[in-house]
Amino acid sequence: SLHAPSALVLTVGHGESAATAVPLRAVTLTCAPTASGTHPATVSACAELRGAGGDFDALAADAGVMCTREYAPVVVTVDGVWQGRRLSYERTFANECVKNAGSSSVFTF
């Protein structure tokens, strides 16, 4: 195929690290050749990831969202392949609101 594969599994769980957090939800996100998967916003999430060059730390936070300072940590993991390269990512957010505001759509699941 002309497109290198981009297929990811994203999970979210309560806790400070993926080693101890039990996954509450898991979604799939495939971005090539077309956007698909169980992620609730495949097209926008793929567009956002392409814009960030597949760098999850480069995703822009949604500036319009105000979150409480409550500390109820959630951890997001991403594993799979992005444009043919293996990828494994983990990030902890202070709470669910902060997670959802951490990107436009990638972490909103």
From Swiss-Prot:
Q: Drop me one GO molecular function for this one.
A: serine-type endopeptidase inhibitor activity
The GO cellular component terms are: extracellular region
- What residues form the membrane-spanning segments? none
Q: Does the keyword Repeat apply?
A: no
Instruction: Please name the SUPFAM superfamilies in this protein's record.
Output: Subtilisin inhibitor
Indicate where this protein is primarily found: secreted
Q: Where is this site: Reactive bond?
A: R69, E70
The record's subcellular location field reads: Secreted
Q: Which UniProt keywords apply?
A: Disulfide bond, Protease inhibitor, Secreted, Serine protease inhibitor
Q: Does the keyword Secreted apply?
A: yes
Disulphide bridges, residue numbers: C31-C46, C67-C97
State what this protein does.
Strong inhibitory activity toward subtilisin BPN' and, to a lesser extent, toward trypsin.
Q: How does it assemble?
A: Homodimer.
Protein family membership: Belongs to the protease inhibitor I16 (SSI) family.
Annotated protein name in UniProt:
Subtilisin inhibitor-like protein 7
The protein's organism comes out as: Streptomyces ambofaciens
